[in-house]
Amino acid sequence: RDSLLRAEAISFDKDSILRALDFVAFNDTTFLIPDYSGDSRFCWVNRQGKFLKKSGVIPSLNEEALKEARPALAQAWRSFIDYNPHNGVLVAATQLGEVLEIYNLQNGFHRVCLGPKGEPEFKLAGGYAIPDGIMGFSDVQVTNEAIYAVFHGHTFKEIMAQHQKEGRATDGGQYIYVFNLQGEPLCKYTLDRYITGFHVDERNKTITATDVNNDQPLSLIHISEP
């Protein structure tokens, strides 16, 4: 069997980085990390883990939470992110609700795409965000031509009901949404399985996906042109 050996470990500045649940490499010297303090949208750090700056804001319409409960709001807005250095497009897809944020770091373009399920919903308890509403996205990839995102769409009530009835709930999303680099919808793929993560190969028109509900978790999915 092949072994995965750690080449390097980077410790982030604990005084500036609240927690790091996802990251992307901006270039050879800089990483972007979602900011879970609620003060901004992203933290920038160097290869040594030193904090450089913050940028962006949480694009929520919940003015009360923005004023009084920003850390909890940031928890609810936890997002999966991806960045393509060739076109400069950075995308954040929310784990709750249905929000896609698009930033072009080369030309300054910024757009917030709000889907029918709306922004993340949560209940405040002891300063923490308790998820409500729906499970949203679980992965996102920015290719040279498009944005792909795995979408779930199940409400937490549906998830709990299935868990009570069957002893477990199906994990993952059955849909892959495809947008152009400006956030305009191109198409939606409905899969015959539920996936959590994926990698898109546009050249060969395939998607390698992970299905955690299956004993054979890796799947190869053939796709058509968006």
Task: Cite the ranges covered by each PLM segment.
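Surface-exposed loop and turn segments in beta-propeller and other repeat-based domains
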Residues: 2-16, 52-73, 110-131, 193
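Beta-propeller blade signature
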Residues: 44-46, 166-182
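Short glycine/acidic-enriched loop and turn motifs that connect beta-strands
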Residues: 37-40, 97-99, 154-157, 213-216
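Short loop/turn segments that connect beta-strands within beta-propeller blades
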Residues: 2, 46-48, 104-107, 180-182
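Short beta-strand elements that form the blades of beta-propeller/WD-repeat-like
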Residues: 28-35, 88-94, 145-154, 205-211
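Structural signature of eukaryotic scaffold interfaces centered on beta-propeller domains
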Residues: 21-27, 73-86, 134-143, 199-201
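Residue-level detector of conserved catalytic or cofactor/ligand-binding positions
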Residues: 219-226
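Short, conserved, GDST-rich strand-edge loop motifs in beta-rich repeat architectures
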Residues: 150-171, 219
